[in-house]
């Protein structure tokens, strides 16, 4: 089980590395999603869920559907994707930029990154996932933003499995 999960995550990470070299201004979100699907078809049992590729203003939607919006220079892109290996799922989300990071986005990007690093450092046996989420939510509010999604979840044979890292869960 663990080796299948590790393999699925390794392939997904490799797909991210590949797709970063593939994306060019002028491509559509849908073209990128199709390329990800082709990548997985050659290496795995297929997608563990429908790939999300969101760019520009679409990145503000947690579960965006790929559109015909064209990627522009200095665009922000969020990709949420995963595959299945021996029935076990991967699920990774990454946000990056095509070109340079626009100055107006840097504070938000840095806030998210800071909270990701701090949350990973705080994760240990006995800490409540609700508390972890509350810490991030409080920091977002202090900086003028709302937390509009959970922080994460486990994976396995299902794409969403315990532990759930959200204010709705009190897993430790």
Regions found by a protein language model. Give the residues of each.
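Active-site neighborhoods and metal-handling regions in enzymes and metal-associated proteins
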Residues: 1-172
């Amino acid at each position: 089980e663990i080796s299948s999960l590790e393999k699925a995550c390794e392939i997904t990470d490799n797909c991210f590395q590949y797709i970063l070299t593939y994306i060019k201004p002028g491509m559509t979100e849908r073209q990128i999603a199709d390329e990800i699907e082709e990548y997985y078809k050659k290496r795995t049992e297929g997608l563990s869920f429908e790939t999300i590729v969101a760019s520009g203003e679409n990145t503000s939607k947690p579960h965006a559907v790929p559109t015909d919006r064209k990627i522009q220079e200095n665009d922000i892109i969020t990709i949420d994707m995963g595959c299945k290996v021996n029935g076990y799922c991967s699920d990774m989300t990454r946000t990056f930029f095509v070109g340079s990071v626009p100055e107006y986005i840097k504070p938000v990007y840095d806030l998210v990154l800071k909270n990701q690093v701090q949350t990973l450092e705080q994760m240990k046996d006995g800490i409540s996932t609700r508390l972890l989420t509350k810490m991030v939510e409080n920091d977002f509010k202090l900086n003028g933003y709302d937390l509009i999604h959970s922080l994460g979840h486990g994976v396995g044979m299902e794409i969403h499995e315990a532990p759930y890292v959200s204010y709705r869960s009190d897993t430790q």
